[in-house]
Amino acid sequence: MKMFNTLDFVEVAAGHFQAKQQFGQYQLSVVLLPGKTTYEIALFDDDMFVQLPGIHPDYYNEYSDDVIPRLLPVDVDLIMMKLYMMWAYA
């Protein structure tokens, strides 16, 4: 199973790093922004932002942000495990 330590971060702009990982139909994007020590993630389905229950903290609110900020590597690991389980057992 892919975990945070297996992500391949690429510098997409000065000091801006991004890694992508596919889980079935969903693509996870993990970003480290310049000057930050925590990560943010977003999920995509066919290049469109998606929100998933159990991953997005405010999923049931009328409006919640597609991007989940201020994540530690262990938080990203937990999200990756959930995505893997959704994909592997679908």
Residues covered by each model-derived region:
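Conserved small-residue motifs centered on glycine
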Residues: 41
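Negatively charged, low-complexity tracts enriched in Asp/Glu with abundant Ser/Thr
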Residues: 1-38, 62-66
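Mixed-charge, Lys/Arg-enriched low-complexity segments
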Residues: 1-3, 10, 44-90
